[in-house]
Every structure is written in C-alpha cells, then in structure tokens.
C-alpha cells in the first residue's frame, strides 16, 4: 500500500507539531520544577488557615500573616483538594513579595503544575516522535536498477 505525497506531508507536519509541542511542554515543566526548587531553598514559612472554599474546594482561600506582620488572603490554586474551612496549613512565600508568591506546602500545589506539563510533554513528544519514526520506516526503498 502506498501513501500519497500529500498525506505524507500532512503526517510529517502533524508528527513534527506534536514533537515540538511535546518538547515545549517538557521544557516548560522542567523550568517550573527548577524554579520551584529554588523557591523552596529560600522560602519563608508561616502558619495559615483555610478561611473559605472556592470552586468547590479546589481553590481554598488561605489567610496568613507574614514575618513582617502583613496580613494576606489569597485563593490557592493547583492540584489540591480535601481542605476544610478552619484547617491550619503551612504557607511558604518569598520574603520580598509574600502576597504574590504564597503557596500552601502541599505536593499538588508545589509540584502539580510541573508534573502536569512534563507528563503531557512526554505524551505529546512520544506520539510525535513515533509518528516521525513511522513515516521514516514507511518510505519506499529504491532497489537501484
């Protein structure tokens, strides 16, 4: 069975796009993970409290007071669930910008985004590279008459 030149080019384009998207997601996930690692090395910590549950509990409202006495309330995002109003939580933040950098000390909040990006990057990359390899192996061979 032969493939037409047009479908071959379309397959090459799709496989290349999946490969590039996968690589981009892997790089973004790696960058996010390294960034988080550096954040944890210098982060301040404070005790906080869950004051409300937003979006069905997947974005709890966290209240805490920084070391400098600033009172902060923010909605925590990320891959987290199961929090209850009034529950104490450990909050990590950068001393110079506590409101913008605060994050609950929870594996899903800390590492979820990086893991998600890397996981989808690997998936897209594998699909793309397998597509490229499949196109390469399906090339007609010339017998040199």
From Swiss-Prot:
The chain crosses the membrane at residues 9-29, 109-129. Keywords: Membrane, Transmembrane, Transmembrane helix. It is found in: Membrane. Immunity protein that plays a role in preventing early activation of toxin Tse4. The lineage of its organism: Bacteria, Pseudomonadati, Pseudomonadota, Gammaproteobacteria, Pseudomonadales. The keyword Transmembrane applies. This is Immune protein Tsi4. It comes from Pseudomonas aeruginosa (strain ATCC 15692 / DSM 22644 / CIP 104116 / JCM 14847 / LMG 12228 / 1C / PRS 101 / PAO1). The keyword S-adenosyl-L-methionine does not apply.
């Amino acid at each position: 069975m032969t493939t037409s030149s047009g479908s071959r080019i379309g397959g090459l384009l799709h496989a290349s796009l999946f490969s590039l998207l996968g690589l981009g997601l892997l790089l973004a996930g790696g960058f996010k993970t390294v960034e988080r690692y550096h954040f944890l090395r210098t982060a301040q910590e404070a005790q906080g409290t869950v004051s409300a549950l937003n979006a069905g509990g997947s974005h709890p409202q966290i209240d805490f007071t920084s070391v400098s006495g600033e009172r902060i309330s923010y909605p925590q995002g990320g891959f987290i669930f199961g929090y209850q109003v009034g529950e104490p939580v450990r909050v990590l933040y950068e001393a110079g910008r506590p409101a913008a950098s605060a994050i609950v000390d929870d594996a899903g909040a800390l590492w979820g985004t990086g893991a998600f990006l890397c996981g989808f990057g690997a998936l897209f990359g594998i699909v793309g590279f397998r597509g490229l390899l499949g196109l390469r192996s399906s090339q007609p061979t010339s017998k040199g008459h």
